[in-house]
Amino acid sequence: MLEAALDALHTDWKPLIIKILNKYPDIALQLKGEYQKYKGITEIYPPVEKIFSAFSHFNQKDLKVIIIGQDPYHQMGQANGLAFSVEEGVKIPPSLR
């Protein structure tokens, strides 16, 4: 399940994230469990393959600031794994205006 999210990573974050998930397997189990628990009942945003997408845009050495968002995305197709962001062409939700 998390393999799809990791396969999408092509930066130097990938080995670090794999190392962390291997060292702390409860993190991966919790993520997988939440997605499995609600599968077929409701949608969880972002889709599992996008949960690490924030790490696909730059390498570790280029990190300057971390911004963590907490406002939920309510509509399908809005959450893309980046705080305060939607994909191009997606109507901007009220919480981001």
State where each predicted segment sits.
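GGW-centered surface loops in extracellular recognition modules
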Residues: 1-4
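A polyanion-binding, active-site-adjacent surface
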Residues: 7, 11-97
